[in-house]
Curated annotation (Swiss-Prot):
Segments traversing the membrane: none
GO cellular component assignments: eukaryotic 43S preinitiation complex; eukaryotic 48S preinitiation complex; eukaryotic translation initiation factor 3 complex
ATP-binding in keyword set: no
InterPro entries recorded: eIF3l, PCI_dom, TPR-like_helical_dom_sf
Protein name per its UniProtKB record: Eukaryotic translation initiation factor 3 subunit L
Keyword Protein biosynthesis belongs to the record: yes
One GO term (biological process): formation of cytoplasmic translation initiation complex
Protein localization: Cytoplasm
Entry function: Component of the eukaryotic translation initiation factor 3 (eIF-3) complex, which is involved in protein synthesis of a specialized repertoire of mRNAs and, together with other initiation factors, stimulates binding of mRNA and methionyl-tRNAi to the 40S ribosome. The eIF-3 complex specifically targets and initiates translation of a subset of mRNAs involved in cell proliferation.
Quaternary structure and partners: Component of the eukaryotic translation initiation factor 3 (eIF-3) complex.
Organism taxonomic ancestry: Eukaryota, Metazoa, Ecdysozoa, Arthropoda, Hexapoda
Length: 539
C-alpha cells in the first residue's frame, strides 16, 4: 500500500481545518507584551530563512531559539501566530516553520502537556508543511539545516506517539473532548497519515535508489531525480526512513522496522550519520528490534558500537542540553538492553563497555537475571523499551478506562515468555562448562531442586527438553554482510557445544582465546604514528 512508487496524493485538504491557533496565546501566555529581543529574533529569523543562509539559520535554531526559550518562555508558550504575523509581513512559510517550533515547545515545556485543540492544530500545521513541499511539481525554494530536518521528522513521529497515548487515556477526558475525538477528528494523527507522509518523502527523494547506487560504487546523483538532487529533499527522505523504523518499532512490527532500512548499511558509517541524535536513535531502535527478534548477537554488536561512539564523541554535543537529555536517556536504556542481551546470550564485548557495566553496578542485576530473577528482567525491559502505542484508538463503545498500557503489557508478555523459556539455560551452561563428559542422570540430579528424590523418567524427559532448548536458543541468525539488516547466517552463540551419545553428554569448549599480541601490535603502531606526527610538527 505504501510502496516507493506510490505518488503523493495529498489527502489532507478534506479535513477542513482552520489555519490559526485560536486562543493559544491567550490561554498560555496571558497576553504578556513581547520582549524586544524576541521581536528582533523573529524578524531576523524570517529574513535568513527567506535568503536561504543555512549556517545562520542553524545558529539561530540551535543556539538563539533555545536561549530565548530559557530566558523568556521556560514555563509558557511562545507568542501566538497572530502576534507574530505582522512582524514578518504575514510570511506564510515562515509562520508554518515558526508554529512547528511553537508546538514543539508546548509539548516539551508546558506542564500537563498541550490541550486537545493544540494537539489538533499541531497536526494541521504539519499537514500545511508537507502539503507545501510534497505536491509541488518542482523543488521548493527552501533550505534548512540538517539538524532541523531531523528534529522535525523526529518530533512528527513523537507527537503521533504522544497523541496515541493521550487518546488511549479515556479517564481524564471531558464529554466535549470525547465528542471532538470521536466525531470531528477521527483522522487526526491517524497511523495511515503518518505512514503516507513518511513513505511519500522517501519516494520523492529517491533516497533508496541513491543509497543503493552509492553502495554499488555508482554516482547517486544519476538516480536522484529532480527532487533528490536537493539536500533538503534528500535528507528529509533519509530521516523519514529512520522515522519509519521508529513507527514500526512503536507498533511492535520489528521485522518491518529493520526492513525499511534495507538500503542503509546499519553497521557502517556513512555521509548521512553526521547528526549524533539521529545515529543514536537509529541504533537504539535497530538494537531493540534485533533483541525482540531473538537476534542477540546483532543486538549486542549494534548497542556496543553506538555506546563506544557515544563515549568518544560525547563532548561534541554535551553543551546542548536539549539534545543531551535525550541522548543520556537513550544511552542508559541501551546499557539496560545490552545487559539483558548479555545474560540471554553471553559473549565478549569491548573492555570499555564492560568497565561502564561494572562501574554502574549492572553486574549485580545481571547476576540476578542469570539466577532466573524475572522481576529484574521485567524492570529492565520496562525502563529501556520504547513507549509502545496501538495503531488504532479504543472503540467508541469502549468502557471509560485507561488503555495506555495495553500495548506495553502485550510487548512485556512477549518478551517475558521468551525469557521464561530460557530461565534455566544459564544454570545448564554453568554445569556443562565444568565437564568434558557428563552422564545425563548426573546432570539431572544437579538440576533437581530436591536432590533427595530419585530422578524419574519425567525429570529426565524435562532435562532433555531443556538441553534441546539450549541447542535451539544458542543458534541465531547473525548479520555478516550486505545492506539488508535482515540477512545473515545461522551461527552458534555459545562458548560451548555438546552432543548426546546414549546416556552421556559430550561437551566441547569452543571459546576462542584472546590474541593479546594483535592488540599490543596495533597500539605500538598507533603510538609510532603519533610520534612521527609530533616530530613532523616540531620540524
Amino acid at each position: 500500500m505504501y510502496s516507493n512508487e506510490e505518488p503523493w496524493e495529498g489527502g489532507y485538504d478534506e479535513y477542513g481545518y482552520e489555519m490559526g491557533m485560536p486562543e493559544d496565546g491567550m490561554y498560555d501566555r496571558g497576553y504578556f507584551p513581547m520582549h524586544e529581543d524576541v521581536k528582533k529574533f523573529l524578524m531576523y529569523f524570517c529574513t535568513v530563512i527567506k535568503d536561504g543562509v543555512v549556517y545562520e539559520i542553524q545558529n539561530l535554531y540551535e543556539n538563539t531559539f533555545p536561549k530565548l526559550s530559557e530566558q523568556h518562555f521556560e514555563k509558557k508558550a511562545w507568542p501566538s501566530e497572530e502576534e507574530v504575523a505582522h512582524l514578518v509581513d504575514n510570511d506564510n512559510l515562515f509562520l508554518i516553520l515558526y508554529k512547528e517550533l511553537y508546538y514543539r515547545h508546548l509539548h516539551a515545556r508546558i506542564q500537563g502537556g498541550p490541550s486537545l485543540e493544540q494537539r489538533l492544530n499541531s497536526f494541521y500545521n504539519y499537514c500545511n508543511f508537507f502539503n507545501y513541499i510534497l505536491p509541488s511539481k518542482e523543488p521548493v525554494q527552501l533550505e534548512l539545516p540538517d539538524i532541523w530536518l531531523w528534529e522535525l521528522i523526529d518530533e512528527f513521529v513523537y507527537q503521533f506517539q504522544n497523541f496515541a497515548q493521550y487518546r488511549a487515556r479515556l479517564t481524564d477526558k471531558t464529554d466535549e473532548e470525547m465528542d471532538m475525538l470521536l466525531n470531528n477528528n477521527s483522522k487526526v494523527w491517524n497511523i495511515l497519515c503518518i505512514l503516507n507522509v513518511l513513505h511519500s518523502l522517501v519516494s520523492m527523494s529517491k533516497i533508496k535508489d541513491q543509497l543503493e547506487a552509492a553502495a554499488a560504487g555508482k554516482d547517486p546523483e544519476a538516480v536522484a531525480g529532480e527532487f533528490g538532487r536537493h539536500s533538503f529533499y534528500k535528507m528529509l527522505g533519509y530521516f523519514s526512513l529512520v522515522g519509519l523504523l521508529r513507527v514500526h518499532s512503536l507498533l511492535g512490527d520489528y521485522h518491518q522496522a529493520i526492513k525499511v532500512l534495507e538500503p542503509i548499511e546499519i553497521h557502517k558509517k556513512s555521509q548521512y550519520s553526521h547528526i549524533p541524535s539521529c545515529q543514536i536513535s537509529t541504533s537504539y531502535y535497530v538494537g531493540f528490534a534485533y533483541m525482540m527478534m531473538r537476534r542477540y548477537s546483532d543486538a549486542i554488536r549494534t548497542f556496543s558500537s553506538i555506546l563506544l561512539y557515544i563515549q568518544r564523541t560525547k563532548q561534541l554535543y554535551s553543551a546542548r542540553s536539549y539534545q543531551n537529555d535525550q541522548i543520556n536517556k537513550q544511552t542508559d536504556q541501551m546499557y539496560h538492553l545490552l545487559a539483558i542481551c548479555l545474560v540471554l546470550h553471553p559473549q565478549c564485548i569491548d573492555e570499555s563497555i564492560q568497565q561502564v557495566l561494572r562501574e554502574k553496578n549492572y553486574h549485580d542485576n545481571m547476576y540476578k537475571m542469570q539466577c532466573g530473577d524475572l522481576d529484574v528482567f521485567r524492570n529492565f525491559f520496562v525502563f529501556a523499551c520504547p513507549k509502545f502505542v496501538s495503531p488504532v484508538p479504543p472503540p467508541p463503545d469502549a468502557p471509560i478506562e485507561d488503555y495506555v498500557k495495553d500495548a506495553l503489557e502485550h510487548q512485556i508478555n512477549v518478551f517475558m515468555d521468551e525469557v521464561k523459556q530460557q530461565q534455566e539455560l544459564p544454570t545448564i551452561r554453568s554445569y556443562l562448562k565444568l565437564y568434558t563428559t557428563l552422564p545425563i542422570m548426573k546432570l539431572a540430579s544437579f538440576m533437581d531442586r530436591k536432590p533427595q528424590d530419585e530422578v524419574d523418567e519425567q525429570k529426565l524427559e524435562n532435562l532433555l527438553t531443556r538441553l534441546l532448548c539450549f541447542k535451539h536458543k544458542m543458534k541465531n541468525v547473525v548479520w555478516t554482510k550486505g545492506s539488508s539488516g535482515l540477512e545473515g547466517k545461522f551461527q552458534s552463540g555459545s562458548e560451548l557445544d555438546f552432543y548426546i551419545d546414549k546416556d552421556m553428554i559430550h561437551i566441547a569448549d569452543t571459546k576462542v582465546s584472546h590474541r593479546y599480541g594483535d592488540f599490543f601490535i596495533r597500539k605500538v603502531m598507533k603510538f609510532e604514528d603519533l610520534n612521527r606526527r609530533l616530530h613532523a610538527i616540531k620540524g
